[in-house]
Amino acid sequence: MIIQDLASFIEGNIIGKDSFFDDEGFTGRFTFLNDAIDGDIVIRHKINDKGVEIAASKNLACLITQNPQDGACDKAIELNFPLIIVDKIELATAYALKWTIEKFSPDSKNVIITGTNGKSTTSHLIYHILKNTESHVLTNTDSESEFNTLIDPMVSKLISDEVKNNGKLDYLVIEVSEVQGWLGNLMKHHAYLMASAVKPCVGVITNIAMDHIGLVNSIDEVFDEINQVPNAIGDGVTVLNYDDDLVMKLTPNNPFLCSMNKFDSKNPHVYYDDGIFYEGNLILENNDLPFTSHHFIQNILSAVAACISLDIDIKNIVEGVKSYRPLNRRFSKLHENPLIVDDFAHNPDGIKATIAETYKLLPKNQTLYVVCSIRGSRGVEINKLNVEALVESMNDNIKLVL
C-alpha cells in the first residue's frame, strides 16, 4: 500500500512528505502514539506539534488526524513527516479495522452486536460460549465499556496484538455502538460503517430505543442509524429481537428470530417459555439460566441464536450458558440479605427494566430503595429522560435516592 491509496480510502489530504516516512513504508499496525513502534500508523482525533515530533522520532509510517492543532501542520512540513488530515476520523478507524482483520485474522468467523441495550452482555455471553468450545476468541466487550466505541484504533490494536502474542483467531466478537459521535457531532451511519469493516457472518440487533440524546433527537433517527446494519451483514445471519417493533421493521436477507413469547405468526426460531426452546425443543431450563430478569433473558436468547447460526453444537451452547458469569454491573447481586443489586442501566428503557425486575425479587410489601447517580457528562436531555423513567417506575413501596 502507498500513502496516496491510504489517503484516498479515508478521504484525507497529505501534509508534509508525500510518502510513508520510512522508505520501507507501512510495515506495522494501526495503534496509539504511546504504544507505537517503527513502521506503525497512529490515528488520533487531535494532534499538536509535539505529537508530530514524537511520531517522527519513533519512525512511524504516518499520522492520521481530524484536528491538527498548535502548529502540527507546520511541524509536519518542517520534519518532512507525512500527516494525513481527514474530515471524518471514523473513516480512518473503519479502514484500520478492515485492514487489520484482513491482515491478521482473515479466516476468522466474525460476529457483530449492536442495538441500544444489551450489547455488552450479549457480546460477552457469545464470547464465553465460543471460548468454552476451546476456540481462540477475541471480543472488544469489557465491563467498563471502554473498547466498544470503535472511534479510535483500540480494537485494531487488540486484534493485531492478540494474533501476534497468541496465534490465529477462530472468532471475532465485536460490539458496535448503535449511535456514535465526537465533540457533540454525530458520526452518521457509524454502526453500518464499522459492521461493514468487520464483514460479519452473523450479526445481532438487540433493540432500538432512545439514548445518546444530542447526537440523535428522536427514535426515528436511532432507527436510521441501525437500519443499514443488515446491509453490512449481507447474506450472513441477522439475529433479531422479535419483541421489538422497530427491530422487526428491519429487512435483513437472512433473519433469525428470537422472542420472549412462544406463539407467534412468524414462529421465532428461539423463544422463552419458562426455559429456552429451539425449534420447539427445550434446551435450557429456567434453573440453568445465569439471569432471571426479562431483559437479560432476551440477551441470552440472542446469544444462543448467534451461536446456533455459527453452527455451534447445542450441547456446547448449553454448557456455555450454564457456566456463564455476568460482567460486573450487569444486574449483579452484591448482597443477599439485604438484597443489593448493581446495574449499569443508563437510558430510560434500561432503568425501567432494572427497577421492574429488581422489584419482582422483593418479598411482598418490602421497600425497594433505588439509588441512582445522574452523570452530567451524559447531557441534559438524556438525564431528563432518565429522571422521568425513574419517576414513572415509582410506587408506594419504592423510594428514590438521587
Where is each model-derived feature located?
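N-terminal leader/targeting and accessory segments in enzymes
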Residues: 1-95, 99, 292
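Glycine-rich phosphate/pyrophosphate-binding beta-alpha loops
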Residues: 47-49, 326-329, 342-353
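Active-site beta-alpha connecting loops in nucleotide-dependent enzymes
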Residues: 47-53, 327, 357-402
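Short, conserved loop/helix-junction motifs that constitute active-site signature segments
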Residues: 55-59, 76-78, 195-199, 229-234, ...
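Short internal beta-strands
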Residues: 61-68, 204-207, 239-243, 369-372, ...
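Acidic, Mg2+-coordinating active-site environments of NTP-dependent enzymes
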Residues: 72-74, 165-169, 173, 199-340, ...
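Phosphate-binding loop of NTP-binding sites
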Residues: 92-240, 246-254
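Active-site glycine- and acidic-residue-rich loops that bind
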Residues: 148, 152, 179-186, 342-352, ...
